[in-house]
Amino acid sequence: MHFSHDTQLTLRDACALVNSDRAHGRPLADQAALDAFLDIQGWTGRRDRDNAELAAVHALRDRLGAIWTAAGRGAGAEEDAVAAVNALLADTHAAPWLTRHPEMPQWHLHLASPEDPLAKRMGAEMAMALADLIRAGELRRLKTCAAPDCDAVLIDLSRNRSRMFCDTGNCGNRQHVAAYRERRRET
């Protein structure tokens, strides 16, 4: 399944935000950590740099984490995810408009003004990217790392939906080494 470039970037950003509070993540404990996260992810626009903004981003992170959790439940997952995405779109008053700028010169959608509060902009963009995923029937691309000691989430954008491990803690390599050692022990 092919998603637009900005949808893929935003899905990865949502994943990184959720993982900031999970195994091997970099917690967003203070404004400096949030600023570093936003710079790494390339978020532009208004930043208030206060405790209210940090709390709003933490609340958004929790809402996104619930969507990943819903996606992994199987039966009823889609309806739960749709309800959560619709609530996020409604709460952010998402209003799509085409734009381009030096950071991303190709035309893409923004769903909030650069002057809107940070959590509102992030929530609107991330909710729309998740809506694209759901509309394409690809909710199962939202996964939790298969490593037994990791609770990080991932977005599987591979062609055949085969990705199993997160990027946060070398989980895939650790699992493959453990399986190899187990096979060697059996022989």
Residues covered by each model-derived region:
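Cysteine-rich micro-motifs
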Residues: 161-172
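Short helix-coil boundary/hinge micro-motifs
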Residues: 1-144, 151-155
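Contiguous alpha-helical segments
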Residues: 182-187
